[in-house]
């Protein structure tokens, strides 16, 4: 009985904090990935193989056809968010910039993955990626941000 008096308030407190965690939009993980000539970022579903293939594409730029940002995000179910990824690069000592945007569906309790791609002539004119910044927007208000070390 005494254990129930201690356990029940802890359970109620933990349950009450769940909606607060799900309500705030956040960017969890951003993975910049090169794409090969067929638009693939990996040859198999294995994470080890993906990392090895990405290292190969980093060493051999002539095999690349684009750059994809796989972004894991979480947001409230009631809000439609917009994701924006800003890129800074360099092409033959000339600084370059690019912006990728996507309107996201409604969030929910679990996280979601979205992919934003820079490919074709835009990628060829962009050059090498130096830094990036990903943001989540609710209307005109920025609600979450993650950026690379060099941003």
Give the label of every model feature segment.
Residues 1-6:
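Positively charged n-region of N-terminal signal peptides that target proteins for export
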Residues 7-17:
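Bacterial N-terminal signal peptides
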Residues 22-43:
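A eukaryote-biased signal for short, well-structured alpha-helical docking elements
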Residues 41-75, 111-118:
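Contiguous beta-strand segments within globular domains
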Residues 61-109:
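Mature extracytoplasmic domains of secretory-pathway proteins
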Residues 108-128:
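Short, solvent-exposed, Trp/other aromatic-anchored flexible loops in extracytoplasmic proteins
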Residues 128-142:
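Internal, hydrophobic beta-strand segments that form the core of beta-sheet-rich folds
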Residues 142-151:
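Short beta-strand elements
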